[in-house]
């Protein structure tokens, strides 16, 4: 750690744990050392994806950080043979390791690296396969000739620290010159094969070809076996059947530029503006309960869109310190109010229903015709529990436990259908990526689908694309007049491209995603009512 300049902030003795049983038995924990490291990210927008870019006009290079021979001791390969091994790889030259790391960082900064993946458990062959798994098509043609050593097994399975990087042909000479000048060893190892779904590997006279989809099935099997112990109602099997059949699809409005300027927004607004108490400024209040945890992302999304944002705790409403009379929009954020002890949002709803001042403030707010409201995740559950979306329905909607009976957290696809929502109507026809994180997100909708103002649907009817089993694949609904919206996914956590698990590569320079438009629409509507 001293040699490479890494501080050790703390330590935990995990090698002496024992478990005592009433009958006197004592189990000593196996010797285990876990080392976790973290590093500064100076620009979250300048990151490299581990997913291979399917472009034949690119090259893959292997950079070994270890300056050591390939060794199989302690590797996943050795363990798969029931062995451990004593000949393990190490970092022989700490300064060389630092030089390699710094060189890769500089190439990322210069925009030369299209994709990259570390070499760790499973070795080089696992790295190459994992770079292809997330793609629906395409493969790799690999030649190990330039990697030092005579043992192809060691080349493929040794876990010496290193990386594989993908470089466009237009930058390959710059990359080679840069690495050579900095005395960094590298080996060209292959190119993508966009038309063939295989990993082809050659090393001299030795050749092998692997079916990527078959390898992915093997790679995924352990996850399936664990999932089977956690998920109910056969959802683990559903996930195993569907995880390769539900690709993320993106479709934006034709006039979407991805710039803040398109919406008249300024990311540096906070540097130049001061709080404005003028009555003509749109004001939004974020209402929180004990356990709410999504208020900061929501506050920033609203503020960026032009709102002045107010933080309101339930105690403010219960005591009468806050009446919502000067607020144009209220937002109920995600989280786990009251730790979900009474069920999702049940306790939060009770705080409104059984505290006269809080109930009066809410009733008066919803009685006005110049207001908007938004509920996300736990806030969506609250709005449905309080029957704020469709009070005219004879049969009430409910949010129930996910069909899998477990907490679901994933990045998936939504389609925005035609709707009259203030926030979402302009996004009709879009297909967008978004995060979900909930345990009780299944919409039970007892009325016919056309009785609901549906503002968002999961792209796929089957699990896991529909993560909770919601009726009609519904992810969000709105009041009949379009003013009050409740949805389970977190649009406030997806307003920037760097927040999304996947965003179209050709749009990587976008400043914002289409989700920001929903907040801008809300602000414009409020302004029209002032």
Per-region residue spans from a language model:
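Proline-centered loop/turn at the N-terminus of a beta-strand
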Residues: 5-7, 185, 370-372, 483
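N-terminal beta1-alpha1 cap of cysteine-dependent amidohydrolase-like domains
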Residues: 203-376, 380-391, 401-408, 471, ...
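Active-site glycine-centered loops adjacent to acidic/histidine catalytic or metal-binding residues
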Residues: 118, 377, 490
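Solvent-exposed alpha-helices and their adjacent loops that cap or buttress functional pockets
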Residues: 25-29, 51-55, 106-109, 155-159, ...
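Short, acidic Gly/Pro/Ser/Thr-rich loop/turn segments
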Residues: 42-43, 67-70, 172, 291-294, ...
């Amino acid at each position: 750690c001293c040699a490479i300049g890494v501080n050790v902030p703390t330590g935990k003795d995990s090698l002496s744990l024992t478990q005592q049983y009433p009958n006197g038995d004592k189990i000593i924990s196996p010797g285990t050392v876990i080392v976790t490291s973290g590093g500064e990210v100076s620009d979250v927008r300048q990151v490299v994806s581990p997913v291979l870019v399917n472009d034949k006009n690119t090259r893959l290079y292997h950079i070994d950080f270890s300056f050591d021979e390939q060794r199989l001791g302690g590797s996943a390969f050795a363990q798969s043979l029931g062995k451990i091994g004593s000949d393990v790889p190490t970092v022989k030259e700490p300064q060389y390791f630092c030089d390699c790391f710094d060189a890769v960082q500089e190439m990322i900064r210069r925009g030369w690296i299209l994709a990259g993946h570390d070499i760790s458990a499973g070795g080089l062959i696992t790295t190459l396969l994992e770079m292809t798994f997330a793609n629906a098509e395409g493969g790799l043609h690999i030649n190990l000739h330039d990697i030092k050593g005579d043992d192809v097994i060691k080349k493929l399975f040794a876990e010496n620290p290193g990386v594989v990087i993908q470089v466009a042909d237009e930058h390959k000479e710059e990359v080679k010159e840069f690495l050579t000048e900095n005395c960094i060893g590298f080996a060209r190892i292959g190119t993508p094969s966009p038309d063939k779904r295989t990993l082809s590997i050659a090393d001299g006279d030795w050749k092998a070809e692997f079916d990527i989809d078959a390898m992915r099935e093997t790679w995924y099997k352990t996850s399936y076996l664990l999932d089977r112990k956690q998920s109910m109602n056969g959802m683990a099997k559903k996930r195993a059947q569907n995880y390769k059949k539900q690709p993320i699809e993106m479709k934006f409005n034709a006039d979407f530029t991805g710039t803040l300027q398109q919406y008249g927004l300024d990311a540096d607004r906070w540097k130049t503006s001061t709080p404005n108490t003028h009555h003509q400024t749109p004001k939004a209040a974020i209402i929180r309960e004990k356990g709410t945890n999504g208020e900061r992302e929501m506050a920033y999304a609203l503020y960026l869109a032009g709102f002045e944002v107010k933080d309101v705790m339930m105690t403010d409403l219960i005591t009468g310190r806050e009446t919502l009379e000067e607020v144009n929009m209220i937002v109920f954020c995600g989280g786990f109010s009251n730790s979900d002890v009474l069920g999702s949002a049940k306790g939060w709803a009770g705080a409104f229903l059984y505290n006269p001042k809080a109930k009066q403030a809410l009733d008066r707010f919803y009685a006005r015709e110049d207001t908007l409201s938004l509920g996300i995740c736990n806030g969506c559950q609250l709005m449905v529990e309080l029957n704020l979306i469709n009070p005219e329905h004879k049969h009430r909607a409910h949010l129930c436990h996910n069909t899998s009976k477990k907490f679901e957290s994933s990045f998936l696809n939504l389609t925005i259908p035609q709707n009259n929502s203030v926030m979402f109507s302009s996004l009709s026809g879009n297909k967008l990526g978004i995060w979900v994180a909930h345990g009780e997100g299944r919409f039970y909708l007892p009325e016919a689908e056309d009785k609901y103002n549906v503002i968002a649907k999961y792209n796929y009817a089957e699990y896991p694309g529909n993560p909770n089993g919601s009726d009609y694949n519904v992810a969000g609904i709105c009041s009949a007049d379009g003013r009050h919206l409740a949805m389970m996914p977190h649009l406030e956590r997806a307003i920037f491209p760097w927040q999304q698990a996947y965003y179209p590569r050709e749009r990587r320079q976008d400043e914002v995603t289409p989700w920001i438009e929903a907040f801008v629409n809300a602000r414009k509507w409020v302004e029209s009512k002032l």
